[in-house]
Amino acid sequence: MLELLQAVLLGAVQGLTEFLPVSSSGHLLLGQYFLGLDQDRFGLSFDVALHLGTLVAVVVFFRRDLLRMAGAFVRSLTRGRDLSEPDQRLAYLVLAATVPAALIGYLWEDFFETAVRSPWVVVFNLAFVGLLFLVAEAVGRKSRRAEKMGFAEAVGIGLAQAAALVPGVSRSGATITLGLLFGLRREEAARFSFLMSAPIIAGAGTLQLGEVLAEGMGAEQALMFAVGFLCSAVVGYLAIRFFISFVARYSLRAFAYYRFALAALVAALLLL
Protein backbone atom coordinates (compact mmCIF):
# COMPACT_ATOMS: atom_id res chain seq x y z
CA MET A 1 0.00 0.00 0.00
CA LEU A 2 2.84 2.40 0.84
CA GLU A 3 4.46 1.83 -2.55
CA LEU A 4 1.10 2.44 -4.25
CA LEU A 5 0.70 5.76 -2.44
CA GLN A 6 4.24 6.74 -3.41
CA ALA A 7 3.45 5.90 -7.05
CA VAL A 8 0.34 8.10 -6.88
CA LEU A 9 2.33 10.96 -5.35
CA LEU A 10 5.19 10.67 -7.84
CA GLY A 11 2.76 10.58 -10.76
CA ALA A 12 0.94 13.65 -9.46
CA VAL A 13 4.21 15.53 -8.84
CA GLN A 14 5.44 14.70 -12.35
CA GLY A 15 2.18 15.76 -13.98
CA LEU A 16 1.98 19.00 -12.01
CA THR A 17 5.59 20.13 -12.19
CA GLU A 18 6.25 19.05 -15.79
CA PHE A 19 4.02 21.85 -17.04
CA LEU A 20 4.22 24.48 -14.31
CA PRO A 21 7.50 26.46 -14.49
CA VAL A 22 8.84 25.12 -11.21
CA SER A 23 11.06 22.20 -12.41
CA SER A 24 9.80 18.63 -12.32
CA SER A 25 13.30 17.16 -12.03
CA GLY A 26 14.11 19.57 -9.20
CA HIS A 27 11.01 18.65 -7.21
CA LEU A 28 11.52 14.93 -7.77
CA LEU A 29 15.15 15.24 -6.66
CA LEU A 30 14.12 17.15 -3.53
CA GLY A 31 11.41 14.59 -2.84
CA GLN A 32 14.02 11.86 -3.11
CA TYR A 33 16.50 13.73 -0.89
CA PHE A 34 14.14 14.82 1.90
CA LEU A 35 11.21 12.35 1.78
CA GLY A 36 12.81 9.22 0.37
CA LEU A 37 10.55 9.31 -2.70
CA ASP A 38 12.59 7.52 -5.33
CA GLN A 39 10.97 6.68 -8.65
CA ASP A 40 14.01 4.56 -9.59
CA ARG A 41 12.85 1.92 -7.11
CA PHE A 42 9.87 1.23 -9.39
CA GLY A 43 12.14 0.53 -12.35
CA LEU A 44 12.34 1.86 -15.89
CA SER A 45 8.73 0.96 -16.63
CA PHE A 46 7.49 3.52 -14.09
CA ASP A 47 9.64 6.25 -15.63
CA VAL A 48 8.14 5.37 -19.03
CA ALA A 49 4.64 5.54 -17.54
CA LEU A 50 5.26 9.08 -16.27
CA HIS A 51 6.57 10.17 -19.67
CA LEU A 52 3.64 8.64 -21.54
CA GLY A 53 1.16 10.15 -19.09
CA THR A 54 2.47 13.68 -19.60
CA LEU A 55 2.56 13.07 -23.37
CA VAL A 56 -1.13 12.10 -23.32
CA ALA A 57 -1.90 15.27 -21.36
CA VAL A 58 -0.25 17.45 -24.04
CA VAL A 59 -1.79 15.58 -26.97
CA VAL A 60 -5.31 15.67 -25.55
CA PHE A 61 -5.20 19.34 -24.57
CA PHE A 62 -3.60 20.53 -27.82
CA ARG A 63 -5.21 17.94 -30.10
CA ARG A 64 -6.66 20.56 -32.47
CA ASP A 65 -3.34 22.40 -32.83
CA LEU A 66 -1.45 19.15 -33.33
CA LEU A 67 -3.90 17.85 -35.94
CA ARG A 68 -3.72 21.11 -37.89
CA MET A 69 0.07 21.12 -37.70
CA ALA A 70 0.31 17.49 -38.78
CA GLY A 71 -1.99 18.13 -41.74
CA ALA A 72 -0.03 21.22 -42.73
CA PHE A 73 3.26 19.32 -42.48
CA VAL A 74 1.96 16.53 -44.73
CA ARG A 75 0.73 19.10 -47.25
CA SER A 76 4.19 20.68 -47.26
CA LEU A 77 5.65 17.32 -48.30
CA THR A 78 3.12 16.67 -51.05
CA ARG A 79 2.49 20.17 -52.39
CA GLY A 80 5.63 22.05 -51.40
CA ARG A 81 6.37 24.28 -48.44
CA ASP A 82 4.49 27.51 -47.88
CA LEU A 83 5.79 28.98 -44.65
CA SER A 84 3.38 31.89 -44.89
CA GLU A 85 0.65 29.43 -43.84
CA PRO A 86 0.46 29.73 -40.02
CA ASP A 87 -0.07 26.03 -39.22
CA GLN A 88 2.71 24.92 -41.56
CA ARG A 89 5.09 27.53 -40.22
CA LEU A 90 4.30 26.55 -36.64
CA ALA A 91 4.95 22.89 -37.46
CA TYR A 92 8.39 23.72 -38.85
CA LEU A 93 9.16 26.05 -35.94
CA VAL A 94 8.40 23.23 -33.50
CA LEU A 95 10.61 20.92 -35.56
CA ALA A 96 13.44 23.48 -35.53
CA ALA A 97 13.12 23.81 -31.75
CA THR A 98 13.05 20.05 -31.25
CA VAL A 99 16.29 19.19 -33.07
CA PRO A 100 18.83 20.89 -30.74
CA ALA A 101 17.00 19.72 -27.62
CA ALA A 102 16.87 16.14 -28.91
CA LEU A 103 20.56 16.10 -29.90
CA ILE A 104 21.80 17.55 -26.62
CA GLY A 105 19.50 15.30 -24.62
CA TYR A 106 20.66 12.20 -26.48
CA LEU A 107 24.36 13.03 -26.19
CA TRP A 108 24.52 14.56 -22.71
CA GLU A 109 21.57 13.24 -20.69
CA ASP A 110 23.68 10.75 -18.72
CA PHE A 111 26.12 13.52 -17.77
CA PHE A 112 23.38 15.85 -16.56
CA GLU A 113 21.65 13.06 -14.63
CA THR A 114 24.79 12.22 -12.67
CA ALA A 115 27.13 15.22 -12.53
CA VAL A 116 24.65 17.91 -11.44
CA ARG A 117 22.17 15.98 -9.27
CA SER A 118 22.78 17.96 -6.10
CA PRO A 119 20.20 19.77 -3.94
CA TRP A 120 22.43 22.85 -4.04
CA VAL A 121 22.24 22.87 -7.84
CA VAL A 122 18.45 22.84 -7.50
CA VAL A 123 18.57 25.71 -5.00
CA PHE A 124 20.70 27.85 -7.30
CA ASN A 125 18.62 27.16 -10.41
CA LEU A 126 15.30 27.71 -8.64
CA ALA A 127 16.45 31.19 -7.63
CA PHE A 128 18.29 32.05 -10.85
CA VAL A 129 15.47 31.08 -13.20
CA GLY A 130 13.01 32.88 -10.91
CA LEU A 131 15.10 36.01 -11.42
CA LEU A 132 14.95 35.44 -15.19
CA PHE A 133 11.14 35.34 -14.94
CA LEU A 134 11.17 38.84 -13.46
CA VAL A 135 13.56 40.10 -16.14
CA ALA A 136 11.47 38.61 -18.95
CA GLU A 137 8.29 40.13 -17.53
CA ALA A 138 9.99 43.53 -17.27
CA VAL A 139 11.57 43.73 -20.73
CA GLY A 140 9.55 41.37 -22.95
CA ARG A 141 7.16 43.07 -25.40
CA LYS A 142 4.60 40.24 -25.07
CA SER A 143 2.84 41.09 -28.35
CA ARG A 144 3.68 38.35 -30.90
CA ARG A 145 2.11 35.04 -31.80
CA ALA A 146 4.30 31.94 -31.96
CA GLU A 147 3.79 31.65 -35.74
CA LYS A 148 5.55 35.01 -36.19
CA MET A 149 8.85 33.82 -34.74
CA GLY A 150 11.95 33.34 -36.84
CA PHE A 151 13.68 29.98 -37.08
CA ALA A 152 16.76 31.22 -35.20
CA GLU A 153 14.48 32.14 -32.30
CA ALA A 154 12.89 28.69 -32.39
CA VAL A 155 16.34 27.06 -32.25
CA GLY A 156 17.18 29.30 -29.29
CA ILE A 157 14.08 28.13 -27.45
CA GLY A 158 15.09 24.55 -28.28
CA LEU A 159 18.47 25.16 -26.63
CA ALA A 160 16.64 26.54 -23.60
CA GLN A 161 14.65 23.31 -23.47
CA ALA A 162 17.91 21.34 -23.42
CA ALA A 163 19.13 23.44 -20.47
CA ALA A 164 16.26 21.99 -18.45
CA LEU A 165 18.21 18.72 -18.20
CA VAL A 166 19.84 20.44 -15.22
CA PRO A 167 17.62 19.94 -12.13
CA GLY A 168 15.90 23.09 -10.93
CA VAL A 169 15.83 24.88 -14.29
CA SER A 170 12.35 23.78 -15.53
CA ARG A 171 11.74 22.97 -19.18
CA SER A 172 8.62 25.09 -19.39
CA GLY A 173 10.21 27.86 -17.32
CA ALA A 174 13.29 28.14 -19.54
CA THR A 175 11.39 28.00 -22.83
CA ILE A 176 8.60 30.36 -21.78
CA THR A 177 11.13 32.86 -20.42
CA LEU A 178 13.03 32.95 -23.70
CA GLY A 179 9.73 33.18 -25.59
CA LEU A 180 8.82 36.27 -23.57
CA LEU A 181 12.25 37.80 -24.24
CA PHE A 182 11.58 37.19 -27.96
CA GLY A 183 8.36 39.18 -27.63
CA LEU A 184 5.77 36.39 -27.50
CA ARG A 185 2.57 36.89 -25.56
CA ARG A 186 2.55 34.85 -22.35
CA GLU A 187 -0.10 32.40 -23.53
CA GLU A 188 1.69 32.03 -26.88
CA ALA A 189 5.02 31.36 -25.18
CA ALA A 190 3.32 28.71 -23.03
CA ARG A 191 1.51 27.22 -26.03
CA PHE A 192 4.74 26.91 -28.04
CA SER A 193 6.57 25.48 -25.02
CA PHE A 194 3.99 22.75 -24.54
CA LEU A 195 3.69 21.95 -28.26
CA MET A 196 7.45 21.52 -28.59
CA SER A 197 7.48 19.26 -25.54
CA ALA A 198 5.36 16.63 -27.32
CA PRO A 199 8.02 15.29 -29.74
CA ILE A 200 10.71 15.36 -27.04
CA ILE A 201 8.58 13.45 -24.53
CA ALA A 202 7.41 11.06 -27.27
CA GLY A 203 10.97 10.37 -28.39
CA ALA A 204 12.28 9.74 -24.88
CA GLY A 205 9.27 7.61 -23.99
CA THR A 206 9.52 5.54 -27.17
CA LEU A 207 13.19 4.73 -26.62
CA GLN A 208 12.55 3.65 -23.04
CA LEU A 209 9.36 1.77 -23.95
CA GLY A 210 11.36 -0.47 -26.28
CA GLU A 211 13.59 -1.49 -23.37
CA VAL A 212 10.58 -2.12 -21.12
CA LEU A 213 8.84 -4.31 -23.68
CA ALA A 214 12.05 -6.28 -24.21
CA GLU A 215 12.39 -6.92 -20.47
CA GLY A 216 8.69 -7.52 -19.81
CA MET A 217 6.67 -6.49 -16.74
CA GLY A 218 5.43 -8.44 -13.76
CA ALA A 219 2.01 -7.89 -12.18
CA GLU A 220 3.32 -5.41 -9.59
CA GLN A 221 5.21 -3.41 -12.21
CA ALA A 222 2.14 -3.34 -14.43
CA LEU A 223 0.06 -1.93 -11.56
CA MET A 224 2.63 0.77 -10.83
CA PHE A 225 2.81 1.54 -14.56
CA ALA A 226 -0.96 2.05 -14.72
CA VAL A 227 -1.03 4.19 -11.56
CA GLY A 228 1.87 6.39 -12.67
CA PHE A 229 0.44 6.78 -16.16
CA LEU A 230 -3.06 7.75 -15.01
CA CYS A 231 -1.90 10.15 -12.30
CA SER A 232 0.62 11.97 -14.50
CA ALA A 233 -1.88 12.18 -17.39
CA VAL A 234 -4.81 13.51 -15.37
CA VAL A 235 -2.79 15.91 -13.21
CA GLY A 236 -0.74 16.99 -16.25
CA TYR A 237 -3.88 17.86 -18.22
CA LEU A 238 -5.27 19.88 -15.31
CA ALA A 239 -1.92 21.64 -14.88
CA ILE A 240 -1.83 22.67 -18.56
CA ARG A 241 -5.42 23.89 -18.41
CA PHE A 242 -4.73 25.91 -15.27
CA PHE A 243 -1.46 27.40 -16.51
CA ILE A 244 -2.75 28.49 -19.93
CA SER A 245 -5.69 30.21 -18.22
CA PHE A 246 -3.40 31.75 -15.59
CA VAL A 247 -0.85 33.29 -17.94
CA ALA A 248 -3.60 34.75 -20.13
CA ARG A 249 -4.47 37.00 -17.18
CA TYR A 250 -1.48 37.16 -14.86
CA SER A 251 2.31 37.42 -15.02
CA LEU A 252 4.93 34.84 -14.06
CA ARG A 253 5.89 36.82 -10.96
CA ALA A 254 3.93 34.49 -8.68
CA PHE A 255 6.00 31.54 -9.93
CA ALA A 256 9.21 33.56 -9.49
CA TYR A 257 8.31 34.23 -5.86
CA TYR A 258 7.43 30.56 -5.34
CA ARG A 259 10.85 29.58 -6.68
CA PHE A 260 12.59 32.09 -4.40
CA ALA A 261 10.66 30.82 -1.36
CA LEU A 262 11.35 27.16 -2.17
CA ALA A 263 15.04 27.87 -2.79
CA ALA A 264 15.31 29.65 0.57
CA LEU A 265 13.46 26.84 2.38
CA VAL A 266 15.59 24.09 0.86
CA ALA A 267 18.81 26.02 1.56
CA ALA A 268 17.77 26.44 5.19
CA LEU A 269 16.98 22.71 5.53
CA LEU A 270 20.32 21.78 3.97
CA LEU A 271 22.19 24.03 6.41
CA LEU A 272 20.44 22.67 9.51
Curated annotation (Swiss-Prot):
GO term, biological process aspect, one: response to antibiotic
Cellular component GO terms, alphabetical: plasma membrane
Instruction: Write out the catalysed reaction.
Output: di-trans,octa-cis-undecaprenyl diphosphate + H2O = di-trans,octa-cis-undecaprenyl phosphate + phosphate + H(+)
What's its membrane topology? Multi-pass membrane protein
Pfam families attached here? BacA
Transmembrane segments annotated in the record for this chain = 42-62, 92-112, 120-140, 149-169, 194-214, 224-244, 252-272
Which keywords does UniProt give here? Antibiotic resistance, Cell membrane, Cell shape, Cell wall biogenesis/degradation, Hydrolase, Membrane, Peptidoglycan synthesis, Transmembrane, Transmembrane helix
Signal peptide range: none
What compartments host this protein?
Answer: Cell membrane
The role this protein plays is:
Catalyzes the dephosphorylation of undecaprenyl diphosphate (UPP). Confers resistance to bacitracin.
As for family, the record states: Belongs to the UppP family.
Q: In the UniProt entry for this protein, what further remark is given in the free-text comments?
A: Bacitracin is thought to be involved in the inhibition of peptidoglycan synthesis by sequestering undecaprenyl diphosphate, thereby reducing the pool of lipid carrier available.
Know the name of this protein? Undecaprenyl-diphosphatase
